[in-house]
Structure formats: structure tokens, C-alpha cells
Regions:
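Active-site helix/loop module of the DD-peptidase/beta-lactamase fold
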Residues: 86, 91-95, 109-147, 151, ...
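Short alpha-helical patches at coil-to-helix transitions and adjacent helical residues
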Residues: 13, 95-101, 133, 186-191, ...
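Active-site SXXK
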Residues: 30, 43, 49, 90-116, ...
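Bacterial Sec-dependent N-terminal signal peptides
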Residues: 1-21
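Catalytic tyrosine of NAD(P)H-dependent dehydrogenase/reductases that use a Tyr as the general acid/base
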Residues: 90-93, 184-186, 321
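Catalytic loop of the DD-peptidase/beta-lactamase superfamily, centered on the K-T-G motif
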Residues: 20-57, 73, 158, 199-204, ...
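Short, charged, amphipathic alpha-helices and their helix-cap/turn boundaries
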Residues: 69-78, 155-179, 204-224
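A short, polar/charged loop-to-alpha-helix boundary motif
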Residues: 61-82, 342-350
Length: 359
């Protein structure tokens, strides 16, 4: 019995050592790149029903930590700059779009909404301003045809908004640059409209809908859209690497998580269909996103596969990079803060290529 136990333990430690050795290039990449990604980063990789890689780096200098604490005090926030783990919560910016699109799809699954529904049916103010024929599908894919302001201006405008109704009234006044479905402009407006629609249908706040329909069943205990007057579906979520990984696992498993069907497989597949064809004019696409293939519902199509999209992703302004590779059967997330826009897409590609080579 003792001999069997000893052999089992030795085998376990030998396997662990080999696994650590195998992923050493990833450790080295994370250590090298973290100073360029805001000084703190977490990388998780999931394959074959388990986490196969988990590592974090904190490269903040003493001076950077002092500056961060001073800024936090000014903003009356609590901050821990000494630790950065898979359970550290940070704003994830446009990674929110993937979550919000999935939330909208829960209404599609229930038959309460169709992607072909026009928004004027639910929000008459948009019809009054000539925007009522925009569809829910176009809202989730940045194909509304609305010429939204630049990101900084858009966020500044949202600071003065006190209700979802006021946010939609503001969007209704924005100029149009093309017919719905003909122009791609990456912005916050489409997701904001979709968020207002599901609030209208349900009579509940966007934050509550997210908590009930996604956060709770996916055990995303530290993920939310804040407590501001108006939720920002396109970029207002805060999360942890561990929480967001649960969402990615659900997407990888065609809507299933822990034996529960959160989204239908059909909805997950619909979310991954590229809608930005050669006939669509690109009015604005962030350079750091590296527009190479297209955009679906709340997510970029990074790579084509044998059956449509192979890899889908939804990177955020602050540098976090979640992705799902359907053909290789894994998902991963790089969670970080303040990554520089220059060379960001190349860094994402380098990381994914390295991960692919190790799996």
C-alpha cells in the first residue's frame, strides 16, 4: 500500500514538473511583456475540461505603487497594488461587449426578442429621428449606420446622463452616415440601444438582468456593470480572470456550463457569424483590435476556420484579451491594465501563436 502511494505521489510530482517545464515559454513571455501591459497581468488557459495554465505577474515598481495609491485616495477608491491574481477585479472595458451580446441572446432563446426586430418597435424615439429600422443584429455588430462620437467624447457625454431613456434620446439625435448594415463603426451606441431594448421588454435594469441571467448561473461572483445611474453595456463591466474564464468556458462548450444550458448552441453559433462583409464600408475600427477578418455579435472574428469562424475574441481598451479557439478546443484570457495601443494587436497575435504551439 505504501509503495503504491509513493509511486502515485512521485508520478504526480513528475507530471507537474513536466507541465511546468512545458509552459516555461509562456512564463517567460508573461514576465517579459508585463511591464508593457501596465505592470500587472494574469494569464489563464482552459482545455480538456480543466485549467492547464495559470500564472500572474506584478512588475509594478515602488514608485508606481505609490502613485497608484495616491490616485486611488483622490478618487476615494480602495486599491491593492501588491497582489494581482486570477481573483483580482479590474475594469475590462470592451470585453463587456461579449457579455452584453450574450445577455441579449438569452432573450432571443426565450422567444422574447428576435435579431431581426427593429428597435423602433421598442424605442419610439429612435423612429422619430429616422433610426427606427435598425435591427437588434445590427446593434450588436456596430452596423447601425449611426455616426457616433469618438470614444473619449462618448464617455464624457455618458457622465452627464441620468437614465437609460436619456441615453437613448441622446443617441437619437446623432447623425447618420449610412443605411443600417452598410457601414461598420466600432462604438458604444449599438450595445446601448440593445441594452435599453431588453430593459424595456423585461421591466428590469440592465445590471439586474446581467446578474440574474449570466453572472449567477456562471458563478461570476465578482463581475458586474457597476452602480452608476446608467449601465454601459459596451464597456462598463468589471471582472476577474477567473470569472471571465467561466464565461469563455460556456462559449467554448456551446452554451453549457456545469451541466446547465445557459445559452442555446444555436445562439452561440449565431454570435460567431461574421457580419462585416466586403460590401460593408469601414468607417472606424480601432487599430489595436487589428481588424483582419470581421465582427460578429459582440465579438471579433480573429481567424477563419474550416466552418466559419475559428477564433473569436473581444479585447478591451485597457488591454485585456479573452479568446476562444473552437478548432483547437481551448479558451484563454489575458487580464491586464493600461496596455499601450501601439503594437497591441501584434502582441495579441504573438501570444496566441505561442499558446497554440504549446497545446
Amino acid at each position: 500500500m505504501k509503495q503504491t502511494l509513493l509511486i502515485t505521489l512521485l508520478s504526480f510530482f513528475l507530471f507537474s514538473a513536466v507541465a511546468q517545464d512545458h509552459f516555461a515559454p509562456l512564463d517567460q513571455w508573461l514576465e517579459r511583456e508585463t511591464p508593457q501591459m501596465g505592470g500587472r497581468a494574469v494569464l489563464l488557459i482552459y482545455k480538456d475540461d480543466k485549467l492547464v495554465y495559470s500564472n500572474s505577474e506584478n512588475a509594478l515598481t515602488r514608485r508606481q505603487k505609490m502613485a497608484g495609491r495616491w490616485m486611488a485616495r483622490r478618487q476615494k477608491k480602495e486599491v491593492n497594488l501588491d497582489d494581482f491574481t486570477p481573483n483580482s477585479k479590474i475594469p475590462v472595458a470592451s470585453c463587456s461587449k461579449w457579455l452584453s451580446a450574450a445577455l441579449v441572446m438569452t432573450f432571443v432563446d426565450e422567444g422574447k426578442l428576435q435579431l431581426s426586430d427593429t428597435v423602433g418597435r421598442y424605442l419610439p424615439v429612435l423612429s422619430q429621428q429616422g433610426k427606427g429600422q435598425i435591427t437588434i443584429r445590427q446593434c450588436l455588430s456596430h452596423l447601425t449606420g449611426i455616426k457616433a462620437p469618438e470614444l473619449k467624447e462618448s464617455l464624457q457625454q455618458m457622465k452627464n446622463i441620468s437614465s437609460m431613456e436619456e441615453a437613448i434620446q441622446q443617441i437619437a439625435q446623432m447623425p447618420v452616415e449610412g443605411a443600417p448594415g452598410t457601414v461598420f463603426r466600432y462604438s458604444n451606441v449599438g450595445l446601448q440601444i440593445a441594452g435599453a431594448v431588453i430593459e424595456k421588454i423585461s421591466g428590469k435594469s440592465f445590471e439586474q438582468l446581467f446578474a440574474d441571467r449570466l453572472a449567477k448561473p456562471l458563478n461570476m461572483k465578482q463581475t458586474d456593470f457597476g452602480s452608476k445611474a446608467v449601465a454601459l453595456p459596451a464597456g462598463g463591466a468589471s471582472s476577474t480572470a477567473s470569472d471571465y474564464m467561466n464565461f469563455l468556458v460556456m462559449i467554448l462548450h456551446k452554451g453549457q456550463f456545469n451541466g446547465q444550458q445557459i445559452l442555446s448552441a444555436a445562439s452561440v453559433a449565431e454570435m460567431q457569424k461574421n457580419l462585416v462583409t466586403d460590401q460593408v464600408r469601414i468607417a472606424y475600427s480601432p487599430a489595436e483590435a487589428g481588424f483582419t477578418i470581421g465582427y460578429a455579435l459582440g465579438e471579433w472574428v480573429m481567424e477563419k476556420g474550416t466552418e466559419g469562424s475559428r477564433t473569436v475574441s473581444s479585447p478591451g481598451l485597457f488591454g485585456s484579451f479573452p479568446w476562444v479557439d473552437k478548432e483547437k478546443g481551448y479558451c484563454a484570457i489575458l487580464l491586464c491594465m493600461s496596455i499601450k495601443p501601439e503594437g497591441r494587436h501584434e502582441r495579441y497575435q504573438e501570444l496566441k501563436k505561442l499558446v497554440d504551439s504549446l497545446l
